[in-house]
Amino acid sequence: MTIDSGFNHITVLLDEAVEALALRADGCYLDGTFGRGGHSRLILSKLGPQGRLLGFDKDPQAIATGQALAAEDGRFVIVQRSFAELGAEVAGRDLAGKVSGILLDLGVSSPQLDDPERGFSFLNDGPLDMRMNPNQGISAAEFIATAPVEEIARVFKEYGEERFAGRMARAVVERREKQPFTRTADLAEVLKVANPAWEKGKNPATRAFQGLRIHVNNELGDLETGLEAALDALEVGGRLAVISFHSLEDRIVKLFMRKLVKGEADNLPRNLPVQHKTFEPRIKLIGKAQFASEAELKANPRSRSAVMRVAEKLR
């Protein structure tokens, strides 16, 4: 467990993820989602003097934590970028095709969820923001204030998998014409009233809030870009471990890995004039999808939706 600004964060699948990277003492590794540094600290504890670790994060608070770690350990460097940009960062450091392992721990962290001022939570009132980097892009409030009802409904449905997306979007637009949304609790209440069928044990605003967060931070687009960049950055034999927390993320990871296991030309007719190498696998899967243990679920209920997939680069 790491503690930041009074908010507890328990790293999910900590030992399993680091073990999946098959660390070499002198290897070069990337933590694409530094967060509060749980995975990074464990990786560093297993690297030798020649080992290196490069961390990425968009969140200013995560960067501050990372800079403190970098000051303590010269083997570690933190950069304030999305892991979707790791290709450019790796190229600039002459590490393309030389990275031994990459870890991506997707989604929002507990400190982000639990800090009302970040605007991620429908349980604790705060400014309606939701940006991983509050200094970049438009906030959730700005999106809600200007987007057409069809676009809001699309975000709720496509990214939040909300059954009543249209109805909830119309309620949002109707209310914003009278008074703009600036607070999370205000939006959550309107969504709650507009949702006609509450799921047992789940806040009726959950899916819509997820959709907003994913849209505001371009999470799925970043994931698709980041996976491609990660594969290019890895050396042959390098490992990629990805932890996802909802079906949309996991579907992207699963399809990406499946495509590369079968060969990139898997969907092409076999009589097309393409090189045989195009059909050869680029990765192999390491084991099956992993989930949190019973012990971890008891210690950290938020780990219940975590799933980790691991692949090794073949060429």
From Swiss-Prot:
The enzyme's E.C. designation: 2.1.1.199
* Keyword Ribosomal protein assigned: no
Please provide the record's keywords in A-Z order.
Answer: Cytoplasm, Methyltransferase, rRNA processing, S-adenosyl-L-methionine, Transferase
* Biological process (GO), any one: rRNA base methylation
Q: Where along this sequence does the record place binding of S-adenosyl-L-methionine?
A: G37, G38, H39, D57, F83, D105, Q112
Source organism's superkingdom?
A: Bacteria
**UniProt subcellular location:** Cytoplasm
Broad class of the protein's primary localization: cytoplasm
Recorded GO MF terms: rRNA (cytosine-N4-)-methyltransferase activity
UniProt-listed InterPro entries: RsmH, SAM-dep_MeTrfase_MraW_recog, SAM-dependent_MTases_sf
Top EC group:
transferase
Which Gene Ontology cellular-component terms appear in the entry?
A: cytoplasm
Its recorded reaction(s) are: cytidine(1402) in 16S rRNA + S-adenosyl-L-methionine = N(4)-methylcytidine(1402) in 16S rRNA + S-adenosyl-L-homocysteine + H(+)
Q: Which family does it belong to?
A: Belongs to the methyltransferase superfamily. RsmH family.
Q: What does this protein's UniProt record list under function?
A: Specifically methylates the N4 position of cytidine in position 1402 (C1402) of 16S rRNA.
Q: What is the protein name stated in its UniProt record?
A: Ribosomal RNA small subunit methyltransferase H
